[in-house]
């Protein structure tokens, strides 16, 4: 009789017998504006080809990822306030793992931080978060969902 508690599973990695072609590209643009503003953006792409039918490559990379940001390193209150906001997007893709194959959905997030400078003591106070809209997403098939992360920090002797 089969006993699920005594089963042993094996995963054996092998190389493809034919030439596999993978390629990627990226483009980034930062533009400095007046009054300490900066606009930034980037887009990246990756692909793989030349695989035999049914070969599992474990490539696990979305075809496209992009982000756009707006930053200001000093405004108001004698240029003591600063902020950064970044919107991120990632395509969905098929995730291939040793425990299973499944679809990872596309997702987008918004990261933001507000900074206050304390020049007399060379310090910063920051309040922000990653994925501030708390939109849950996965980066791998079977992995836990990722939500928002929020923080307040104090940094001493930074400038």
Annotate each language-model stretch with its function.
Residues 1-2:
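Glycine-rich phosphate/pyrophosphate-binding loop
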Residues 57-159:
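Conserved C-terminal beta-signal and adjacent last beta-strands/turns
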Residues 5-94, 155:
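Gram-negative outer-membrane beta-barrel transporters
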């Amino acid at each position: 009789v089969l006993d699920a508690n005594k089963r042993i599973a094996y995963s054996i990695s092998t190389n493809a017998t034919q030439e596999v072609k993978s390629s990627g590209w990226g483009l980034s643009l930062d533009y400095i504006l007046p009054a300490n503003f900066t606009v930034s953006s980037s887009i990246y792409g990756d692909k793989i080809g030349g695989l035999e039918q049914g070969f599992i490559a474990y490539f696990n990379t979305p075809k496209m990822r992009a982000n756009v940001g707006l930053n200001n390193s000093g405004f108001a209150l004698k240029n003591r306030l600063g902020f950064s906001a970044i919107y991120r997007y990632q395509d969905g893709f098929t995730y291939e793992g040793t425990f299973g194959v499944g679809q990872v959905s596309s997702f987008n997030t918004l990261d933001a931080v507000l900074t206050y400078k304390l020049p007399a003591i060379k310090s910063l106070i920051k309040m922000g978060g990653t994925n501030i809209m708390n939109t849950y997403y996965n980066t791998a098939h079977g992995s836990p969902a990722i939500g928002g992360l929020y923080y307040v920090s104090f940094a001493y002797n930074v400038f």
